[in-house]
C-alpha cells in the first residue's frame, strides 16, 4: 500500500513539474481537456481515427491534445495539411521518435529515421522505383502474378462456392513487393500459400498492435510497468522472417556469381542488392538493411491489398457501379485496339485465355475505373492518421503558434470524410471525381503529403489499377446474401485493414 501511495506521489510531482515547464506550450490552440498525467490518452483507445474525427468536428482544423506529457497537434483538411507539410516543410519534415519504435530497430529504418540516414535510404529506394522500371514490371512480373492468381480463382469460380479473398489478394501484393525487394516470390500451391498466409497474418497482427498508443511512449516513467512483449515479439518474428529472406537472397546471389552470372547490372537487380552494397560500403547499418526491407514488404503489401479489397467490397455492395466499371473496361479494350497497330503483344493479348490490363496502357482509356479507384482512396485511406511528425522549430499555422517539439498528426480519415470538400462523404460516389479540375484531386492525401509521402506510390498506383481492371474484366463479384450488405467496417491500426467477407466470383466468359 505504501508503495502505491509513493508511486502516485511521484507521478503527481512529476506531472506538475512538467505542467510548470510547458504550461504555455501551444496554450492558445483549442482542444479537449485531459486529466492529470494521462492527458487525453484514456479517450484514445480503439478506433482512434473516429475519435480524432469527432474532435475535429468539435474543435476545428487545428486542435491540441495531450498524449501523456507529449504535446500533440492534430491537423485536418487539405489546405491546412498542405500549408504545414509543403509550405513549411522544413519545420514539419521529421518523424516523431517513439521509444517503442526505437527498440525495434534503433530507429534506423526508412519510415522512422530522420536526417542523413533517411535521405540516403530514400534516394536508394527511389532510384529503383522509376517509371521505366515499373512499366517493365507491369508487362512482365505483375502480368505473370495476375495470371497465376487467376488460375486459382478460376478453380473457385467453377465451384460456385463462396470464398474469402483477403489472403489471396494480400499474397499477390506481397509477391509484387518481394520481387522488387528480393527478386523472389511465392507460388500459389498450398504448401507455400500456407507459409505466406502465416506471414500475412503476422503482418496484420503487428499493424493492429502498433497502431494503438503505447502509454510508456508518452509517460516514460511508466515503462517498467507496461507490458510490450506482444508488440516486440511480433516484430521479432517479422525480423527473423525477413532475415531468412535476405540470407536466401545472398546465398542465391553467391551461386550466380560463382557461375559468372555477371551480365545483370545492378540497375536490373532488386532493391536489396543496393541496400547490401551500401551496407558493405559502410554507408548504412545492418539494422537499416533489414528494417527497410520490412518497411517495404509490410507497408507495400498491406496498403495496396486493402485498397483492392475495399474497392471490390464497394463494387459488390453497389452492383450498378460494378456494371459501369465493366462497361468502361470493355470500351477501353475496344478503343485500344482501334488506336494501336496490332503488334505481336497485342495479338497475344487477344488470344490468351487470361488478359491483363496494365496501368500505363489503359489508365487514360478507362476514366470511370480511375474515378472508382480515387473514390476508394478517399473513403478508405490505408493510413487513417498517417505516421506522426514532430516540429523542429516554432511555426505559425492558421494564426496559431505551434511550438518546437510538438508531435503532429495528419488527420487523413477526417480530411477525406469532410463535408466541406466531399458531399455525402460516407457514400461511395465515384462521379464526384468526374471534374478534371486539379482541386478535385488535390484534396486526397491517401499517400501522405510533403517530402515524406509514400515512397512507393507509383508502384501502388500501377499495381492497384492493373489488378482491379484485370479482375473486373474477367469476373463478376456478388454477395452470397444480397439482402445483407457486406461489412465495410475495417480494423484500425497502422493500416486500415479490410474485414473478411465471403463473396462469390463468376467468370464472365
UniProtKB/Swiss-Prot annotation:
Cross-referenced Pfam families, in alphabetical order?
p450 (PF00067)
Residues binding heme:
454
Q: What is the lineage of its organism?
A: Eukaryota, Amoebozoa, Evosea, Eumycetozoa, Dictyostelia
Q: Which organism is it from?
A: Dictyostelium discoideum
- Please indicate which superkingdom the organism of origin belongs to: Eukaryota
As for subcellular location, the record says: Membrane
**Which keywords annotate this record?**
Heme, Iron, Membrane, Metal-binding, Monooxygenase, Oxidoreductase, Transmembrane, Transmembrane helix
Which gene underlies this protein? cyp513A1
> Which protein is depicted?
Probable cytochrome P450 513A1
Q: How does it sit in the membrane?
A: Single-pass membrane protein
The GO terms describing molecular function are: heme binding; iron ion binding; monooxygenase activity; oxidoreductase activity, acting on paired donors, with incorporation or reduction of molecular oxygen
Tell me the cofactors it needs: heme
Q: Which EC number(s) are documented for this chain? A: 1.14.-.-
Amino acid at each position: 500500500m505504501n508503495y502505491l501511495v509513493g508511486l502516485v506521489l511521484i507521478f503527481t510531482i512529476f506531472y506538475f513539474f512538467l505542467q510548470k515547464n510547458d504550461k504555455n506550450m501551444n496554450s492558445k490552440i483549442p482542444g479537449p481537456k485531459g486529466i492529470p498525467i494521462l492527458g487525453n490518452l484514456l479517450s484514445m483507445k480503439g478506433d482512434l481515427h473516429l475519435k480524432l474525427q469527432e474532435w475535429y468536428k468539435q474543435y476545428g482544423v487545428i486542435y491540441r491534445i495531450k498524449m501523456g506529457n507529449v504535446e500533440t497537434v492534430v491537423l485536418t483538411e487539405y489546405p491546412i495539411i498542405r500549408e504545414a507539410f509543403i509550405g513549411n516543410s522544413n519545420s514539419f519534415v521529421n518523424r516523431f521518435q517513439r521509444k517503442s519504435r526505437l527498440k525495434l530497430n534503433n530507429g534506423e529504418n526508412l519510415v522512422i529515421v530522420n536526417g542523413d540516414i533517411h535521405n540516403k535510404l530514400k534516394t536508394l529506394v527511389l532510384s529503383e522505383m522509376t517509371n521505366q522500371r515499373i512499366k517493365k514490371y507491369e508487362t512482365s512480373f505483375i502480368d505473370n502474378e495476375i495470371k497465376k492468381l487467376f488460375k486459382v480463382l478460376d478453380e473457385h469460380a467453377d465451384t460456385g462456392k463462396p470464398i474469402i479473398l483477403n489472403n489471396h489478394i494480400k499474397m499477390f501484393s506481397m509477391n509484387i513487393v518481394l520481387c522488387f525487394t528480393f527478386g523472389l516470390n511465392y507460388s500459389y500451391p498450398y504448401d507455400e500459400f500456407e507459409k505466406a498466409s502465416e506471414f500475412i497474418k503476422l503482418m496484420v497482427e503487428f499493424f493492429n498492435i502498433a497502431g494503438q498508443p503505447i502509454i510508456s511512449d508518452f509517460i516514460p516513467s511508466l515503462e517498467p510497468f507496461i507490458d510490450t512483449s506482444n508488440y516486440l515479439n511480433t516484430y521479432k518474428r517479422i525480423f527473423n522472417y525477413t532475415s531468412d529472406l535476405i540470407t536466401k537472397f545472398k546465398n542465391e546471389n553467391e551461386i550466380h556469381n560463382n557461375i559468372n552470372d555477371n551480365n545483370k547490372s545492378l540497375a536490373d537487380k532488386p532493391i536489396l542488392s543496393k541496400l547490401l552494397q551500401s551496407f558493405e560500403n559502410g554507408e548504412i547499418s545492418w539494422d537499416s538493411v533489414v528494417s527497410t526491407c520490412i518497411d517495404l514488404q509490410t507497408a507495400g503489401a498491406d496498403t495496396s491489398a486493402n485498397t483492392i479489397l475495399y474497392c471490390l467490397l464497394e463494387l459488390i455492395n453497389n452492383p450498378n457501379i460494378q456494371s459501369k466499371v465493366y462497361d468502361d473496361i470493355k470500351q477501353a479494350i475496344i478503343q485500344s485496339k482501334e488506336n494501336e497497330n496490332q503488334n505481336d503483344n497485342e495479338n497475344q493479348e487477344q488470344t490468351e485465355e487470361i488478359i491483363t490490363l496494365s496501368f500505363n496502357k489503359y489508365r487514360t482509356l478507362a476514366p470511370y475505373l480511375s474515378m472508382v479507384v480515387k473514390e476508394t482512396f478517399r473513403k478508405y485511406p490505408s493510413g487513417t492518421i498517417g505516421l506522426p511528425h514532430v516540429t523542429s522549430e516554432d511555426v505559425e499555422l492558421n494564426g496559431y503558434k505551434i511550438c518546437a517539439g510538438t508531435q503532429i498528426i495528419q488527420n487523413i480519415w477526417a480530411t477525406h470524410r469532410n463535408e466541406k470538400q466531399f458531399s455525402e462523404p460516407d457514400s461511395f460516389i465515384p462521379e464526384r471525381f468526374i471534374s478534371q479540375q486539379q482541386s478535385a484531386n488535390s484534396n486526397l492525401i491517401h499517400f501522405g503529403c510533403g517530402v515524406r509521402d509514400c515512397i512507393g506510390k507509383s508502384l501502388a498506383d500501377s499495381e492497384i489499377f492493373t489488378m482491379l481492371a484485370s479482375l473486373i474484366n474477367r469476373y463478376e463479384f456478388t454477395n452470397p446474401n444480397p439482402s445483407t450488405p457486406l461489412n465495410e467496417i475495417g480494423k484500425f491500426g497502422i493500416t486500415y485493414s479490410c474485414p473478411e467477407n465471403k463473396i462469390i466470383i463468376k467468370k464472365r466468359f
